[in-house]
Swiss-Prot record:
This is Endochitinase 2. SUPFAM superfamilies: (Trans)glycosidases. PROSITE patterns: GH18_1, GH18_2. It is an enzyme of class 3 (hydrolase). The lineage of its organism: Eukaryota, Fungi, Dikarya, Ascomycota, Pezizomycotina. Belongs to the glycosyl hydrolase 18 family. Chitinase class III subfamily. It comes from Coccidioides immitis (strain RS). Residues 867-895 form a propeptide. It comes from the Eukaryota. Residues 1-22 form the signal peptide. The keyword Glycoprotein applies.
């Protein structure tokens, strides 16, 4: 397969995965929050990781081009950006911030977590007002927003305040000026969205609750918005609090707004009830308790299910500081929404029927009644599921499904949830169904399930496009979980007496078949590959505690079979196109992976009271491998894959080496140049183990060795350090914790240069130095030398603690723009560099799209006085911080 096709397939699979986490715009229980103007606010990534917000609105672009220097817009994101601005080519200083490194880093993390990030225009103006003066200005403003904050394109040469990261759409929170030009901007943005058909973009508005809204009513009536975040506070005549207390005392209600939206430029737009997150976030008398919020949500969600979209909260920091029972206010509101939603995002369609089953000594016969459910979507509404046909099927003995065969005895019960376009689901049930769940969320998906007696719990989740899942269950499997996320995937499963099973497939197009038998405590199968034609077959039998099979390849076929007393086995395939087969009996095993230029090797070792097993697999493109089996004896399996070769994998030492107890088989595969010696064993397992040597010629030598071990100790170091950096108010101290891992197998010596006498010590590994100007660090602008981490130098470990930022208290004054100077003292501080990722989806038109995806976890803008980023005189504080910064830097560099 060509590189272009592989990359295209990878993008498609990635888009499916991210889509599974993304916002469901048709849900009734979405939660939106505004962020960017909170006093002492946490980073954007904090709220993405720690909250259940579905939509986060970043505010604000608070200066419009017609009022901004050089015809540029301006921005304010509180304490999240340095006091540094873009300059035009002719040297004019704009009001557009260019030091938003934290937002650059956090946007990709939020996207990966499935959060929808919108950039808000407007808010409370700092000094006077903002407005769009002409149609040309409106069009140019929309083009600028798309180029600067939309997807990165080669033809855009303007500023990128968030780097390569992009937002998911734009929000209009207009509270000043006039109502002209905004419908023009919305229509222009809709046209620009078509340039990126693989992603889904949204447009929202945040009007005041008084009707008609002075600034946004014209735009809402004449252009297509996806979400309307109505501020039901700060206005007594339409306050949500007053409605809860006395509905007759309110002039403008949710009912009035629903009628208005249904006659607007997009009658399908979703209405969000906007509430303050605390008594201090807006007018104190407009704050609602969770009980009061439940009353208004339950009333209007039930009354207008097609228009009600959820709740908006102003704002994130106020919510974080207002904790009820240990939970932030906004998280409580999310729980309120989910409790009131009669059809929450994880809803299921459940039915159980009796099935006749007969069992004989030589064969089993199962009669199954199958219901076929078809799901269809239209551009104007979410998917619907309706029964379309019923059929009667009878199977005797074994049931053949997909590309593998499974056998089952007596079926049980199943719960199926389907949310997708063009989805076909088939479910079979019979007597005594304790609990089973099947969740499918793909496009063009077919699911077939049969269950048998007494399966306490089983779960199957498929999330993919063009996916076919077939599952059969047999006697007494306490718990089973199958998760498939792929395009064109086929899965079949059956088991007997298997306490727990987990299968996860993530690929496109892929086929997976799994068979289980008695006493299987746990099983995990994971396949991840772009544009693949992968077939995975796993068979297990008695007393096999755990088995893991992972395939990651293009056009790969993997077959793994396990039998009695197999403690743990891991097989990883990463190649294109490949066929692999491995078998082992009475074995425990350990995976070891070695990699070379164009070859990958996986070694699986095992030891048991009655057997030793070792599997070595080297992988390269276009390879075929065959594996033979033997029973009841110490065995060693060696599977090699090269370009291209035919390989026979044998099990040694043994008196019999064949699938049917035939004579021993030897192998002479083609091995890439170079020699490798592999010694099984670990420091904690000093037992006899065979030694395998791979010479540079096509000869394979397997010989037993006595008490040879290999030390595979991995050293993990957690480093906590503090450094001084520059924030909008001057110097600040940042404490970070990161983890480094040293692995003897992969570590390589890095040559170091001897220090030059008298020269300053070089920065530590992963750091570099830059020079910049700090206007607030001293009475006059000061040139400072910053020691900063290089890009992606410290990737966060799973247990990484969040950076703690100490900010010097400052008065609530507007941002002071100070021109850089070349004079001043030199101080060494550090900053954090951004990191980026790319998200790919397959939807575009936010108005009429048939998006059907699972949501994941916002906005009553009030006037802000320059935001949270303010400045004070640093006559006294700066000197102390300079001294402290120099001391910390000296300790850090060992001076």
């Amino acid at each position: 397969m060509g590189l272009t096709n592989i990359l295209a397939a990878f993008i498609a699979v990635s888009s499916l995965f991210i889509q599974s986490l993304a916002l469901n715009p048709y849900a009734k229980s979405n939660l939106a929050v505004y962020w960017g103007q909170g006093a002492g606010q946490n980073r954007l990534s904090y709220f993405c990781e720690k909250t259940s917000f579905d939509i986060i609105v970043v505010g604000f672009i608070n200066v419009f081009p017609d009022q901004g220097p050089a015809g540029w817009p301006g921005s304010n994101f509180g304490n999240q950006c340095a006091d540094s601005y873009y300059y035009t080519k002719n040297g004019t200083k704009t009001k557009l911030l260019d030091g938003c490194y934290q937002i650059k880093e956090d946007l990709p993390k939020c996207k990966a977590l499935g959060k929808t990030i919108l950039l808000s225009l407007g808010g409370g103006a700092v000094h006077d007002f903002y407005e769009v003066k002409s149609e040309e200005s409106a069009l140019n403003f929309a083009d600028f927003l798309w180029g600067a904050f939309g997807p990165l394109t080669p033809d855009w040469t303007g500023p990128r305040p968030f780097g390569e990261a992009s937002v998911d759409g734009f929000d209009f929170d207009i509270e000043k000026g006039s109502n002209f030009g905004y419908s023009i901007m919305v229509r222009r943005l809709r046209e620009l969205f078509l340039q990126d058909p693989l992603n889904r973009y949204y447009i929202s508005a945040a009007p005041q609750c008084i009707m008609p809204d002075k600034y946004l009513s014209h735009a809402i009536s004449n252009s297509a918005f996806d979400f309307i975040f109505i501020q039901f506070y700060n206005n007594p005549s339409c306050s949500a609090k007053r409605w809860v207390t006395n509905p007759k005392s309110v002039t403008y209600t949710v009912d009035d707004w629903v009628k208005y939206i249904r006659k607007s430029g997009n009658p399908l737009a979703k209405l969000f009830i906007g509430l303050p997150a605390s008594k201090s976030a807006a007018a104190k008398e407009d704050y609602l308790t969770p009980g009061e919020a439940t009353k208004i949500v339950s009333t209007y969600m039930a009354k207008y299910p097609s228009t009600f979209g959820g709740m908006m909260v102003w704002e994130a920091t106020a919510s974080e500081n207002n904790k009820l029972g240990g939970l932030p206010y906004a998280d409580i509101m999310k729980e309120v929404l989910l409790r009131c939603d009669p059809d929450p995002p994880t809803s299921t369609v459940t039915s159980t029927i009796s099935a006749s089953t007969s069992t004989q000594t030589s064969s089993q016969s199962t009669t199954m009644e199958t219901k076929t459910l078809s799901a269809s979507t239209t551009p104007s509404s979410p998917s619907t599921v309706s029964p379309s046909s019923t059929m009667q099927t009878t199977s005797t003995g074994s049931t053949s499904t997909g590309t593998g065969t499974t056998s089952s005895q007596v079926t049980s019960s199943t719960t199926i949830s389907t949310r997708s376009a063009s989805t076909e689901t088939v479910t079979t049930r019979s007597q005594e169904p304790p609990s089973t769940t099947i969740s499918t969320r793909p496009a063009s998906t077919e699911t077939v399930t049969t269950r048998s007696q007494e399966p306490p719990s089983s779960t199957i989740s498929t999330r993919s496009a063009s996916t076919e899942t077939v599952t059969t269950r047999s006697q007494e499997p306490p718990s089973s979980t199958i998760s498939t996320r792929s395009a064109s995937t086929e899965t079949s499963t059956s088991s007997q007496d298997s306490p727990s099973t987990t299968i996860s497939t993530k690929s496109a197009p892929t086929g997976t078949v799994t068979t289980r038998s008695q006493d299987l405590p746990s099983t995990t199968i994971s396949t991840r590959s772009p544009e693949t034609e992968t077939e995975t077959v796993t068979t297990k039998s008695q007393d096999s505690p755990s088995i893991t099979l992972s395939t990651r390849s293009s056009s790969a076929e993997t077959v793994s079979t396990r039998s009695q007393h197999s403690s743990s086995t891991t097989i990883s395939t990463k190649s294109a196109p490949t066929e692999t087969g491995t078998t082992s009996e009475h074995s425990t095993s350990m995976p070891v992976s070695t990699r070379s230029a164009s070859t990958e090797t996986v070694i699986t070792r095992s030891q048991n009271s009655d057997s030793q097993s070792m599997t070595v697999s080297t992988r390269s493109p276009s390879t075929e491998s065959i594996t033979t089996r033997s029973q009841g004896s110490p065995s060693e399996t060696f599977s090699t894959k090269s370009v291209p070769v035919d390989t026979i994998s044998t099990e040694l030492p043994s008196q019999t080496h064949s699938t049917t107890d035939s004579t021993p088989v030897s192998s002479s595969p083609t091995i890439p140049s170079g020699s490798t010696t592999i010694i099984p064993g670990t420091a904690s397992d000093p037992v006899s183990a065979p030694t395998t040597t791979v010479p540079p010629n096509p000869t394979l030598t397997l010989a037993p060795s006595s008490s040879t071990t290999e030390d595979r100790t991995t050293i993990t170091t957690i480093i906590t350090t503090s450094y001084v950096t520059v924030c909008p108010t001057g110097f600040t101290t940042v404490t970070i914790t990161y983890t480094t891992t040293y692995c003897p197998e992969t570590a390589s010596l890095t040559p170091t240069q001897a220090p030059i006498p008298g020269a300053p010590a070089p920065p530590p590994d992963g750091w570099t130095t830059i020079v910049t100007v700090c206007p607030q660090c001293a009475p006059t602008p000061t040139t400072v030398t910053l020691t900063v981490p290089t890009r992606s130098a410290f990737l966060p470990a799973p247990t990484e603690t969040r950076p703690v930022v100490t900010v010097v208290p400052v008065p609530e004054n507007p941002i002071k723009n100070v021109k850089p100077s070349e004079s001043g003292d030199f101080v060494t501080v550090t900053t954090v560099a951004p990191a980026t990722v790319t998200k790919t989806l397959e939807y575009n038109n936010p108005v009429d799209s048939d998006v059907n995806v699972q949501p994941t976890g916002g906005s009553s803008p009030v006037e802000f006085e320059g935001g949270a980023m303010t400045v004070r005189s640093m006559d006294v504080v700066a000197k102390a911080l300079i001294t402290a910064g120099a001391a910390v830097l000296g300790l850090f560099l060992g001076l």
